[in-house]
């Protein structure tokens, strides 16, 4: 049996390589289970988000990490690409589609602080780093007195800016690349990224969705391929798909698309499945937040999914409609006055 080489496009950051390596191993295992000898080769692609030092909110966030990977897919330079789903624009790209979403990691946001302090324990006027307007808005709502500092760089570099946090060189960067020095009291990052890099031990506090709603599809990976796909490759990729994670991501992303908001907008969402007798219920919470933390609107919605087969197209439609309903509720509550969603989008 001859070995088949599959080219997987990925960004070059430590986190992207860790995530893509995880997917590569999943695909090789799935192929082996079907009697095929696969080697998934990582193809590193540099993107604007990796090379620009501008703040993410100024880059707009809308696909800044995805465009070059998608170009490689369309040109046939790679067979598939792995994205953090939250980095993908909600508008579809002709000729491409999301072939699978592996099981979602922890979607929550995490605080990494000096001496393991929680947000409540940080001193008055503490400096907290984040590149996300969504996190800034919700941090300000919880602690109006703190100072937020815009933050760029990979995960180890960000952690290296927290006073008292020591990051080993094997975390994905060299000691010389750990930024400008320890000048912050804390940073806020995604739990999923810290876990995938083996850095979860540095988490001081994980925020529940009542405290801080995550970004839409945070913690979800998207495996993207050409629309016209080799049937064998399609069958193997399908084996790593997690329908529950896919439905949650679809509902959350429908909130963003209905609001016409970009990735940098102060919008949070969290969707999850619960058993309801012989059926499932898909629950969704969504919110829009003022950047100064002074105002917000939230919506809670649910939809019943009949039966146990979560892969049915009708369930995807219900998930989409659930997200649309939540977004319409937010708009009816004045989301457009709470945050200038269109202005945020236009900075992209």
Where are these regions (language model features)?
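Short, Asp-centered acidic motifs that coordinate Mg2+ and/or phosphate
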Residues: 78-82, 185-186
